[in-house]
Amino acid sequence: MHNLIPTVIENTGNYERVFDIYSRLLRERIIFLSGEINDPKADTVIAQLLFLESEDSSKDIYLYLNSPGGSITAGLAIYDTMQYIKPDVRTICIGQAASMGAFLLAGGAKGKRESLTYSRIMIHQPWGGISGQASDINIQANEILRLKKLIIDIMSNQIGVDKEKLALDMERDYFMTSSDALKYGLIDSILVRE
């Protein structure tokens, strides 16, 4: 199956320029993060965030999310960059923001975390496949517990939900509609056509 990226032709008087759709949207300060969050995708998103900050640190950046989640370390790298740069990062869920996708959605600037009407959001505890010697399994289990606490601490601070409640809700897959996510504090508004 081919993954075709649409192009846009921009006509500016004397010449035409052809852009892939993502490059054209980047000019409007829009970044798309779709699919599994992994190191290569994180590198691309981080580079785009840093580029847009260097272009104009006073204008918001729009991060559209449609992700089932993915790597904790890749997600934390994106989150850290979102918090580090000067522009506010508006997060918008389109489709779904699950696991690390929900974490990044909640990591947007307060008051600027949004979702489309029929998107779904899901939070849960970190998980990982562990194998090896008993001592290695113990080391990995301790690291997963450390990351779980870190994610809960950060999300609790971002969305204003008590750490104990958040930890309990994250014990299993916790699915939310946009309305549920709004009540929960994961998002600040639901986008509808005006």
Curated annotation (Swiss-Prot):
EC class (word): hydrolase
This protein's record includes keyword RNA-binding: no
GO cellular component, as recorded: cytoplasm; endopeptidase Clp complex
Subcellular localization: Cytoplasm
A Pfam family per the record: CLP_protease
Catalysed transformations (reactions): Hydrolysis of proteins to small peptides in the presence of ATP and magnesium. alpha-casein is the usual test substrate. In the absence of ATP, only oligopeptides shorter than five residues are hydrolyzed (such as succinyl-Leu-Tyr-|-NHMec, and Leu-Tyr-Leu-|-Tyr-Trp, in which cleavage of the -Tyr-|-Leu- and -Tyr-|-Trp bonds also occurs)
The protein's Enzyme Commission number: 3.4.21.92
PROSITE patterns, sorted: CLP_PROTEASE_SER
Any one GO molecular-function label of the UniProt entry: ATP-dependent peptidase activity
UniProt-annotated catalytic positions: S99, H124
HAMAP family linked: ClpP
Name used for this protein in its record: ATP-dependent Clp protease proteolytic subunit 1
